[in-house]
Structure formats: C-alpha cells, structure tokens
Amino acid sequence: MSHNLLKGKRGIIFGALNDMSIAWKVAERAVEEGATITLSNTPIAVRMGQVDALAEKLNAQVIPADATSVEDLETVFAKSVEILGGKIDFVLHSIGMSPNVRKKRTYDDLDYGMLEKTLDISAISFHKMLQVAKKQLSLIHISEPT
C-alpha cells in the first residue's frame, strides 16, 4: 500500500543486483511511494545481474559506474540530475564487496591489498559520493560544518 511518502522526490540507488538485494527492494518501494530514481552498479554487475529488468519494471535508467572512481561518480550524479529533472533528494549506498571473502580467505590469512579494496568499495565510496554531490551541488541539502 502506497502513502506517496516520496512523491516528487528524486533519488539514486546504488547496488541493486537481483531481487535478493537490499537496494532492489528499496528501489521498488521508493518508486511505489512516488519517487523517480536512477540505478547504478558496476558495468560487470549490470551485465551479469538483473538490474536492467528492474529498471524496465520501475521506468528507471541504469547508469553503470565504478563507485570507487570519482570520475564515474561525477557522471552518475550529473546524468541523474539531467534524467530526473533536478537536484537529488536521496542517495542509497548499498554497496559492499570483499575480495578476501570471495577468495575464501580466512581472517588469519587476509590479503591486505584485498582488504584495502574492500574498504574502498564498501566504505570510502560513500564518502566519494557525498564529496562529488557536494562539489556538483547535486543534492537538495547537504549540511555544512559549523
């Protein structure tokens, strides 16, 4: 049941891969509540996942991007503002990946290079998103430090 809680709001949702993804469910619910959105994930995730099907279902556009790349994020935010017709009201960062886990490395056998990649993908990319949005003035509201 929709209550139009997000009617007229514009958002970018990062990380939808398939119908088991948190980002997927949030995207469905956001649109159900009246939001218009763009979707973003890595180019390989777009090719290998089902995000195109979600985009079609939600009448959303997919903007492939590597969230660890500031240049790619600049493109996502600029294109989203253009596609959605104005500044962005919300961003969902639902991104996480660990090469150590994928390679089944145990805690006492971590590869630190892979751990750095994990942090870049899963955490630092969020800061990069906010930094890009602030520089481009893409978001409706970003608090300033006092």
For every predicted segment, state its role.
Residues A55-E71:
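Rossmann-fold cofactor-recognition segment
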